């Protein structure tokens, strides 16, 4: 599913890039039109291949298959590295902003001949279609890097499964189904965090992307994170302590998928941790006593701590053995009830009785769950919703680390652009992957 989602966004990104380069064909190379066209073919072919063969354990031509998969992984990593370091369009936009600032200041735009010769001559004209292509390209840019990372992960699992044989006596674990039962406070707190985060995000998008961004919107943005991140960290620490108090044994069986999940969680967290580290260095070296700088500094420190505590909680939960027997009995009872309900027509009176029975059963399940399992479910669901809003905000254009200008002025445009473009896609991928891990912890609690 994620391959198709991010693949579709990557195709749309390439379409915007082709349209943008076509409008500026007088100063753009034809390679900038051919390359995204070939990229669309590659994305479609790869998505089709992964959709139909991602779960196959190939038993023929082992060496040839491994070589092809490793070549495809290397191609995706190269495309990811190219996307991280390619700042052509962003430099053009920066050139336009500098020119506008110079005009407002009453200076001639030709005061920087290097910018005029290379970028100012190749700027987007004041047409709606060009602005649409430009804005769409910038908004969809992180999806392309995520697509490369997701495909590399799936291809690596396929590479590990080449030649793998599953014994006939092996009985695979039946994954428990997701049920919103036994949780009350987690969904309430998580929904509140999502609603407030959506309001902060809309305010940020309106004010921070203007010609002269307001400092107040950055204060609101950082304040939201400074309140939310400690709550998430405390929840993860409490969940880890409950895992330690549980009597569940650790699942020590070899599991390639779980091992990959752990590696991806730890590796993707390095993106946000790295950006936060460089941000801390820049803020401490400049003026940490300034209000906005102190908020950004607190945000970076709390983000590092939250990533570490959440990783410990999720990884510990993934290694706990599942309690299968009660789950199986509940599943069989529910299936029997569904079959019985589908065989008869429900009248208005019966519908009221069914609703009352459902509410009573929900209360019984909530009361029968042990307090440890109940708290784990509440924490897991709360963290799922928090990670969703923290995934949405940077994915759709909230990048305060790049737009507030503090770190950019310290490191320089090109250096900070590479740091952000390296860490931001990993951070977005981390939030998305954390949702999957937390849902598994919730289901198996």
Predicted regions mapped to residue ranges:
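Transmembrane alpha-helices of multi-pass eukaryotic membrane proteins
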Residues: 1-6, 27-42, 62-72, 133-148, ...
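Membrane-embedded alpha-helical transmembrane segments of multi-pass integral membrane proteins
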Residues: 6-16, 38, 42-52, 75-82, ...
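Membrane-lumen (extracellular) interface motif
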Residues: 14-35, 51-62, 84-94, 197-225, ...
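Transmembrane-helix exit/juxtamembrane "anchor" motif
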Residues: 48-55, 151-167, 205, 235-251, ...
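Membrane-proximal N-terminal segments immediately preceding the first transmembrane helix
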Residues: 51, 113-129, 162-177, 197-213, ...
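Extracellular/lumenal N-termini and interhelical loops of multi-pass eukaryotic membrane proteins
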Residues: 76-138, 387-414, 418
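Non-transmembrane, juxtamembrane loop and terminal tail segments
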Residues: 104, 167-181, 188, 323-374
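Extended alpha-helical "rod" scaffolds
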Residues: 310-311, 317, 361-364, 372-379, ...
